[in-house]
Amino acid sequence: MGIFTPPGKSDKRDANEEKPTLLGSNSKDETDVEKFWVRPSLGLKLWGPLVPASDNKTGLWTLVAVQSMVGLLCFYRFKSLRIIDRNGALNSVGKSGIRPTSVLVNEPKLYNSAFTQQEAVSGKPLVKKDIADFPTLNRFSTTHGDMFVNTTNVNRNTPSLSAAPVVASPVLSSAGHQSEIMAKSEAKNNWKSFFKSDNWLIFKKVFYLLAGSIILSQSMLEACRLTILRYDPWCEEAKTVREKKFFNNIVKFYHEGIDPTKVKVKDAVSGNIMPTNVPEVRQSVALVRAQTEAENPIISWFGPIEYKPMTFSEFLDRLEYHLDMFEYFQGKRAANETALGFLTGIKTETSNLRDQNAQNRSRILKELKSEDQLSNDLSIKTGNAKIPKGTQRHGFSAAANRSIILEEDVAVPEDIDLNEIWTLYDPWLNLALETSLSIKFIPTVLINQDGITENSMMDTEATIGDKAGVIPENSNKPEEPRQ
């Protein structure tokens, strides 16, 4: 929809000059007709241009359902024809097992030549009947006469004969006249006899069977496309084109503007009429117009009219590319899952090793405690008890925690090898390693050289003796017992 401005008043000459331009523009618009391309599908080609857009799932499923019903109807018709053919064959067989068409009636000798000629022409026998047996032919009289009926008019459902006479005359003038009448009657009933023949019935059965099979197979193919395919190139293309058309319409209607004589915009709050040249108003009106066009039944069914879908070969190429990429990413995902599983296995092994190490440490600690208990028991038996806790010997407590494990066969102290025990546990060596010495030189009063030397030596010996726990001999302090 565009803005239409009525032409102003002008003279006749100007109007005549503008006519060729208008005609030219109209002719251009007429020649520039938008083409319509049939929407693609796999199993709905029988519908021709009525196929909806590929993104219109509702329309596609509707046509699939209708087409499936038509196919089922064809199969139902085929089944009905088979039942009719079977019942007709059973009813037409008499007690002797011979169809009435194979029964030959001996005609009178008067008409043998004529009927023999007719049978030679048509190749079908005739049946002799009385006129009195047909009420429609003998309604107002009781005249009796012979009537010959062609056996091709036998009804398929009942063994009775139809009332379509070939010749009906009580007295025939001549055999030639009778054969002429029979030829004309047979020419008129030729098409009727064809539609009642077995060939026409066979043709209908084959037609309904093939039509039902083709229609149902096409419906199944389209249903598989709609359900199995996760990526449909036609559907994705139709969605993209529909969205582009919607946004292009918004831009188009925005630039076209608003005709104030046709459109009025009111404020939702105050109800006042707003000017149409405001950008916000133009944008809102353009959006509404685009939505209205998108909701058009024809656009909703077919999509954009000027949309040209991709060809079937391009559809197959895109589908193949999608499947290749899907397989590639599936391989990548499998490789990542394998790597994650490997890392998870490493974490599991690490946790198992951690638990195993904790168990080993607890087991070793338990064994050490049991060995300490065993050594304590042996020491008690031999009289070598451990130093009570809280007591110190030689200024350190490390010796109280040390223990010697004896063999099980040691029962008395004489069985212990003292040299080996001393080698393993040397108290003087441990004392030397664990004892730290601190030597301090403290100056004294200045006296003669001999006095300084003697006093220094005495201070040094006293310091060393204090560290070692020994009292010097020259000290005047009384000896105190050490603990």
UniProtKB/Swiss-Prot annotation:
Topological domain ranges for the Mitochondrial matrix compartment: 77-205
Membrane topology: Multi-pass membrane protein
Any single Gene Ontology cellular-component annotation: i-AAA complex
Mitochondrial intermembrane-facing ranges: 1-59, 223-483
Keywords: Membrane, Mitochondrion, Mitochondrion inner membrane, Transmembrane, Transmembrane helix
Basic and acidic residues compositional bias, start-end: 9-20
GO molecular function, one term: misfolded protein binding
Pfam families assigned to the protein according to its UniProt record, in alphabetical order: Mgr1 (PF08602)
GO biological process, one term: protein quality control for misfolded or incompletely synthesized proteins
Region of interest: Disordered: 1-27
Main subcellular location: mitochondrion
Subcellular compartments: Mitochondrion inner membrane
Subunit structure: Component of the mitochondrial inner membrane i-AAA protease complex.
Family named by the database record: Belongs to the MGR1 family.
Protein name: Mitochondrial inner membrane i-AAA protease complex subunit MGR1
Lineage summary: Eukaryota, Fungi, Dikarya, Ascomycota, Saccharomycotina
